[in-house]
Curated annotation (Swiss-Prot):
Cellular component annotations (GO), alphabetically ordered: cytoplasm
Main location per the UniProt record: cytoplasm
Keyword Cell cycle found: yes
Keywords: Cell cycle, Cell division, Cell shape, Cell wall biogenesis/degradation, Cytoplasm, Peptidoglycan synthesis, Pyruvate, Transferase
2-(S-cysteinyl)pyruvic acid O-phosphothioketal found at: C117
Family: Belongs to the EPSP synthase family. MurA subfamily.
Gene designation: murA
UniProt GO MF annotations: UDP-N-acetylglucosamine 1-carboxyvinyltransferase activity
Protein name as catalogued: UDP-N-acetylglucosamine 1-carboxyvinyltransferase
GO BP field: cell division; cell wall organization; peptidoglycan biosynthetic process; regulation of cell shape; UDP-N-acetylgalactosamine biosynthetic process
Amino acid sequence: MDFLEIVGQIPLKGGVEISGAKNSALPILAATLLSQQEVTISALPQVADIKAMASLLQNLGAELDWFNSHTLKLCAKSLRHTEATYDLVRKMRASILVLGPLLARFKECLVSLPGGCAIGARPVDLHLKAMQQLGAEITIEQGYIHAKAAKGLKGNDILFDKISVTGTENALMAASLAKGITRIINAAKEPEIAQLCTFLQSGGVEIEGVGSSELKIRGVESDALSLKDIQIIPDRIEAGTYLCVGAITNSQLKINHIIPNHLQAITDKLIEIGFPLDIQQNSIEIYPAKKRQAFEITTKEYPGFPTDMQAQFMALATQCLGTSVIEETLFENRFMHASELQRLGANISLKTNIATIHGSTELTGSDVMATDLRASSALILAALVAKGVSRVHRIYHLDRGYERLEDKINALGAKVLRLKEK
């Protein structure tokens, strides 16, 4: 198992190229199961979750041809079976995204209950209710979801009690081959969902309301879609993380290959804290702040402040003057990084879903353990400003969602080594 050794308090400067968005690539990869045609997906990030999804598709019988590490040609014309097994699904929660496409196209599938980050209760019941609304029979058998729709899926209204990104994506994909019109009410509005809509539209699916909380989908009257090639959008969470690298080290950094509109909640907060930003069409440059002010954050669904940036801003709060408050409203148990930040010297108190961070604090290098994907990046941020050497363990969490993070940070002047545990 690997860990990262990080020498703190080194000045950083330069630019970072942002990779394709993992959270856009995963549903788009799953959606290729709806198609009988070859489709090429470019700008795929080279991260563990993408490799896991590619392995799952290959196991189902899809033909995969990697042109290079970021471009993949797929063909799901003839699958061997429609069972997504535990061995493959347990590696990440996003595996549940194959449920909608498999059910819609093949009328029956078995999908293991998923794994991935251990962040509180992330139930799949919203996905199952959506499939049932489209006419599926659902049973849970020995840890597997067994979904059947012998006569195919039929369009219907799907009302989500709670906004769900992957739930919306599964419903969208299933509705693409359902007979008639489906309305998804209280849909998630993330840019990654908008790109999935674009991909499905390229295959002939009519979708109204893209980017809004209500989507209207007219299913294609055929057995499969004819999807067109697509390039994955830049990863707004990776971009936000590197903006935080600049912010916590108070360095001048340029973040390239981004869509600034997708980052507005993050950039607004950085400006509020005191950072001058130069926002261009596809880049953002962050400059050192004269004074970093404490702040308050409440995580919300897009376009609100993303829960996937909460941990990074908690690390940043340790270097801001005054008392910062972070309220997590979307997931339970998403403050597991707080105790590890405390090991570095952070002054953090927790009460249910609210974290209070007192700054600014001088951090000291130590051994810390990543508990999930975004927590791992928060610990690396803190280590960059800690006095001495830090070691971040269990970075397999990091590798699920960040492409070559140590290489990108080292190119800015940092000293980060990937080493093997003894």
